[in-house]
Amino acid sequence: MHYCNKDIGSFGETIAVDYIKNCGYIILEKNFRCKLGEIDIIAKDKNFIVFIEVKTRYSYIYGSPSEAITFRKQNKIYKTAQLYIIKKAIHNKFYFRFDVIEVILNTLNSNYSVKLIKNAFQI
């Protein structure tokens, strides 16, 4: 069962949302967009606001999904997060963290694996 990249990404984000809800996160935003970029998921985990990038792949053949998050991409996520923090006026109310969720889909059936990488990068 193969999909185009956009479909794979959307499916992975759905899996990621379910996964972090089960971990106790509260979803605040999905696909937050602004002129600077996009953040897949923004969630609350205890006293942290967590900005989450989801990467979905069918295999590790080209490395782990998180390896696709270059420094340039991290910087875009960071700047987008700054705008969100300012827009919501939450800079003094929470700690902030950048997590990555890797979703690996099985090409033979509907199974998948999920890996949450907390505090995956800092800028």
Swiss-Prot record:
Family stated for the protein in its record: Belongs to the UPF0102 family.
Protein name: UPF0102 protein CLM_2733
GO molecular function: nucleic acid binding
Matching NCBIfam families: PRK12497.1-3, YraN family protein
PANTHER family: UPF0102 PROTEIN YRAN
SUPFAM superfamilies: Restriction endonuclease-like
Lineage top rank: taxon: Bacteria
Coiled coil region boundaries: none
Pfam families the record matches: UPF0102
CDD domains in the record: PoNe_Nuclease (cd20736)
InterPro entries: Restrct_endonuc-II-like, tRNA_endonuc-like_dom_sf, UPF0102_YraN-like
